[in-house]
UniProtKB/Swiss-Prot annotation:
NCBIfam families: tig
Main location: cytoplasm
Gene Ontology terms describing biological process: 'de novo' cotranslational protein folding; cell division; chaperone-mediated protein folding; protein transport; protein unfolding
Protein's name in the database: Trigger factor
Comp. bias regions, Acidic residues: 473-483
Function according to Swiss-Prot or TrEMBL: Involved in protein export. Acts as a chaperone by maintaining the newly synthesized protein in an open conformation. Functions as a peptidyl-prolyl cis-trans isomerase.
PROSITE patterns: FKBP_PPIASE (PS50059)
Species for this entry: Frankia casuarinae (strain DSM 45818 / CECT 9043 / HFP020203 / CcI3)
Principal EC category: isomerase
UniProt GO molecular function: peptidyl-prolyl cis-trans isomerase activity; protein folding chaperone; ribosome binding
A Pfam family per the record: Trigger_C
Amino acid sequence: MKATKETLSPTRVKLTVEVPFDELKPSLEATYRKLARQVRVSGFRPGKVPPRILDQRLGRGVILDEAVQEALPQLYSEAVQAEEVDVLSRPEVDITEFADGGQLVFTAEVDVRPEVTLPEFSELEITVDAVEVTDEQVEEQLGALRDRFAVLTPVERAVQAGDYVSLDLSAEADGTPIDGAEATGLSYEVGSGNLVEGLDDAIIGATDGETRTFTTELLSGEQAGQPAQVTATVRGVKEKELPALDDDFATTASEFDTLDELRADIRTRLEQSRRTEQVGQAREKLLESLLERVEVPVPGSLLAGEIEAREHRLSRELEYIGTDRPSYLETLGQTEEEFDAEVRESAGKAIRSQFILDAVIDAESIGIDQGELMEQLILRAQRSGVQPDVYAQQLAQGEGLTALMADVLRTKALFLLLENAKVVDGAGTPVELALPARSQPDTDADADHDRDVTVAAEAVAPGDGDATVEPVEPVEAETDGNG
């Protein structure tokens, strides 16, 4: 067999494969054996029908075509390996020459991974927010903790902002009660504004047993946007009493003996949280910088598949929450065209980011050891609410394990870039990121062999940060022509 490669574009190549007839004989013989078992001919036992009889019954051309189709996947695979083609899509195969006794010539066009030229890692510079925790932020957290230990005490007075009330609610539009708009004994914090617009103004000043009515605009349902008359009856008023901020409160609400120790712990936790956020910001800005500096073409088939996958996930999400696409777009304040353009841009960035990180993995020979893989498997199992062994079995049934390995490798590549990049805050002061410690790569792990070609979907819709890795691997050739 002879294979040659022609580059059609940075992301697509054309293989031309020439196969002597002698190399097709094993496939031809296998086809005869298979047909001999399938075809029933009087006077011959199953599996014993001679090739010449099969030629007479089925036609030599039909048998040759089937033998070629049987041989194509293996021939294509050998050509890919011989020419070292990193395929990303199903090939488009065309048989350009074939005759009985003559050579087989076919072409296969396929999308490939583009070449990525990486910049010097030390040249990368990003700016992140400085880690700052103010006294006001500490007191805000302390106030939230204090609020959790508040006591609700019944009072006999008019409703005030901050009170907790028990309400009976009903609503009607044009004199007709609205289905599902009734509630009794509903607990509500006055002034929170998280129930019905206009409710706070209506019930402030009311007393236990008093009924107030007001008009508001319906936000959902068939009558969304229409006015509705709401009736609210107060069935009880409770005042929130906060505990005193002292050492006794610190002892009750935490493991600390003094209020100063509790404040110090809150500050430490806030700083840790800000440092974690700082790392996340650095990751995003580093990827943005790489996307600006590195030109990475995206194969059309890969982009189309990623967009389709995102649209499918979005449809499932909308169905789950009980809404439709027009309503969702209205919530976003986007037209169909604007949303589609944003999805397309986001999908393209996701694919380009993965190509860049994969290039870093190859360039730096980043590997993954069993401990790292198990750590991530356990973490994700916990997030999914299943046992690690069950989660591992679920991954093993599909491409999940390969996807997990690719995700871990890319995360390690990103952290390696952050370790080498120049990171400063808004004032230009160098920032030392709180990066996780990197374990030494497993010298036996070969990243190029440990992963398939995968693409991370950043979100169901633009802005969603939960990425899903979906493998894209070579598949058997489909012919669109014959000899």
